[in-house]
C-alpha cells in the first residue's frame, strides 16, 4: 500500500533476548544488515503484517514471541534517488513504518531464516542494543535512532535485570 505522498506502509521488527540484545540480520547475498521488515498488505493491520513478516523472514510464530511495545506513530524514511523505481505506478519514494519490539520467548533454534522458502536473510546474530543505529545503511539511520530511543525505556531494564540476576548467581554464600 502506497499512500498519496508516495510512502509504502511497512512494519519493522526488533526482536530482543533476555539480555536486552537485539537480533541483527544480514540481507540475503549482500553485505548489509538490518532488522526484519516488510510491507503491509491491503486489508491487513500493522500487527497482522508484523506476524506475517516475522514468520516469512525469520520463521517465528506468535507463540515464540511477546509484543513488548510498538511505536506511537508511523516513522518515515525516503529512499535514495537511485533506489526509486520511476516506472512503477504509483511511484514509491520511501517507507512509513510502524515498529514492534518483541521479546523472544522460545529457544533460539526456533529461528529459521528459510521458513518461507524465499529467504530474505542468510545470517543473523545478537548485538548490543545501540549497535544497529551505527551500522544500518545511512538512509535508514534516522528512523533506527528514533525507534531505538523510543524503545530504550522498555528494553534497557531487561539488561539491568539480567545483569543483576547474573551477579546474584555469582555470589558465594
From Swiss-Prot:
PROSITE patterns reported in the protein's UniProt record: NUDIX, NUDIX_BOX
InterPro entries named in the record: Nudix_hydrolase, NUDIX_hydrolase-like_dom_sf, NUDIX_hydrolase_CS, NUDIX_hydrolase_dom, RppH
Disulfide bonds: none
Biological processes per GO annotation: mRNA catabolic process
Record-annotated membrane-spanning stretches: none
Domain Nudix hydrolase: 6-149
Extent of motif Nudix box: 38-59
GO cellular component, one term: cytoplasm
Pfam families cross-referenced by the UniProt entry: NUDIX (PF00293)
EC number: 3.6.1.-
Enzyme class: hydrolase
Keyword Flavoprotein: no
Cofactor: a divalent metal cation
Molecular-function GO term, any one: mRNA 5'-diphosphatase activity
Annotated keywords: Hydrolase
Function: Accelerates the degradation of transcripts by removing pyrophosphate from the 5'-end of triphosphorylated RNA, leading to a more labile monophosphorylated state that can stimulate subsequent ribonuclease cleavage.
Record family assignment: Belongs to the Nudix hydrolase family. RppH subfamily.
Protein name (Swiss-Prot/TrEMBL): RNA pyrophosphohydrolase
Gene transcribed to yield this protein: rppH
Amino acid at each position: 500500500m502506497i499512500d498519496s505522498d508516495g510512502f509504502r506502509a511497512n512494519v519493522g521488527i526488533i526482536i530482543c533476548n533476555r539480555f536486552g540484545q537485539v537480533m541483527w540480520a544480514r540481507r540475503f547475498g549482500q553485505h548489509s544488515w538490518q532488522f526484519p521488515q516488510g510491507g503491509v498488505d491491503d486489508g491487513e493491520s500493522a500487527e497482522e503484517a508484523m506476524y506475517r513478516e516475522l514468520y516469512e523472514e525469520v520463521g517465528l510464530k506468535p507463540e515464540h514471541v511477546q509484543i513488548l511495545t510498538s511505536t506511537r506513530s508511523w516513522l518515515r524514511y525516503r529512499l535514495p534517488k537511485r533506489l526509486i523505481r520511476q516506472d512503477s505506478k504509483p511511484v514509491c519514494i520511501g517507507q512509513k513504518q510502524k515498529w514492534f519490539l518483541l521479546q523472544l520467548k522460545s529457544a533460539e533454534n526456533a529461528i529459521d531464516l528459510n521458513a518461507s522458502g524465499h529467504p530474505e536473510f542468510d545470517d543473523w546474530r545478537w548485538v548490543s542494543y545501540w549497535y544497529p543505529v551505527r551500522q544500518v545503511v545511512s538512509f535508514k539511520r534516522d528512523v533506527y535512532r528514533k525507534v531505538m530511543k523510543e524503545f530504550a525505556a522498555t528494553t534497557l531494564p531487561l539488561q539491568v535485570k539480567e545483569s543483576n540476576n547474573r551477579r546474584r548467581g555469582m555470589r558465594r554464600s
